[in-house]
Amino acid sequence: MKFDVAVVGSGLAALVATRSLQKSGRQPVLVWPGLSSLYFVYATVDVLGYDNPVTSIPVRRPRVGVRELIAEHPDHPFAIAGLAALRDGIKLLTEWLKEAGFQWQGSLDQNFILPTATGTPKPSCLIPDSMAAGDLRRDEPIVFCGFEGYEDFVPELAASNLTKSWGGEDRSASAIRIALPGFEPGRVFTSIDLARSFEDEGFCKEVAERIRDAASVDGDGVRVGLPAVLGLTHDTKVHPRFQRELGMPVFEIPTLPPSVLALRLFDRLRKHLQETGVEVIWNAPAHAAEVSDGRCVRIHLKSAGRDQPIEAKAYVLALEDTVDGAMRAGVHSIQDPFFHHTLEHSAVPTERTDESLFKPQPFARVGYRVTDRLQPIGDDGRPVATNVFVAGGAIAGYDPTGTKSRGGLAVATGYRAAKEAIAA
């Protein structure tokens, strides 16, 4: 099978790279290895939330924050990709979201500040409309609503924590729980269960009535925060309909996995690529690459019990990171799955981790060292293959978790890698 460019990955970087190639008139193939951690970590596109991992002061304007970060850290992936790639990539993504039927908002000119499921403020750049009413730059009181039998969102915890960091004379956060109509007491729900139930108009209407009764407010100046379960496939209709029924602003809050918001985002974008003519190869992880005369001539996929070779003029490795299984971790070393080079070696395996879950983890910085064109670098300091380009979390030397920059880096490097692949 021969293509212009083969994109390997299952996340936002892979999707942005594929879309960029498609819009440039190329014939890409998207090799989707399988379920990735993006279903668990993505709900918004976070470009740059904090300028360093230890500060609690959010970045107000992502464009300005990234420009300053590039000036201070010229070897950062944002610097390699370039501010122009971030700007153009975000423009590409926002236009694509609209074309694919999403209702999102945001820009590089400002960050929203949104409450998490635990009630901590979190800066985000691009968000679904269904989350916008939760912006903590507004002062209206918040009522967090949970559901009996659904344990992935604890409204009392969210209200307590948010009160400490955000509450004040004109701000308040409280919590309620309601029983869901049509179910026996003791029933346990998942996010998917609830998302499907909320697509029923009658169910929505009765839930809205119960929330009004439990909240004991007339709706004037109050907003309601719910776990993100307002529809699985028809969310653009469910959220505004439910908000009308309730008579108050409603916002969704991302919860524990599986993330309904992420399922909506990635499944719909992936489907849109297929509907517009992009070939997608499913559940076929790449396990080897053939290099001749400094160029990759083909990659090999594990597909349905057989080896499947893919040939292309260029390749974009838009893998995620060690959490997604993009790298092969042994006791003492971590290898990449294509060229089988050692990316990291630890005499003591525990050096890869920090005992504290809330501190930066060394393993998160493992990945490909790249050139200024995002080509993977070998042990000799030269590109392993001149027509291979890396995007996303597989680039070495940074951990986006603390700075809330995973989405921005995926967009910038995915877009830049696609442009380099076109020129290869």
Features from the language model and the residues they span:
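Glycine-rich active-site loop/strand segments that organize a redox cofactor
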Residues: 43-84
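Helical element adjacent to the flavin cofactor pocket in flavoenzyme catalytic cores
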Residues: 153-166, 201-220, 224, 230-289, ...
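Glycine-rich FAD pyrophosphate-binding loop
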Residues: 23-43
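Short hydrophobic core segments
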Residues: 6-8, 31, 286, 309-320
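Conserved beta-strand-loop-beta-strand element in the redox core of flavoprotein oxidoreductases
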Residues: 270, 289-309, 315
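A conserved FAD-binding loop/helix module that cradles the flavin
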Residues: 19, 325-332, 385-386, 393-424
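N-terminal Rossmann-like FAD-binding beta1-loop-alpha1 element of flavoenzymes
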Residues: 3-30, 418
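Glycine-/small-residue-rich beta->alpha transition segments that form the dinucleotide
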Residues: 34, 304-305, 312-314, 318-325, ...
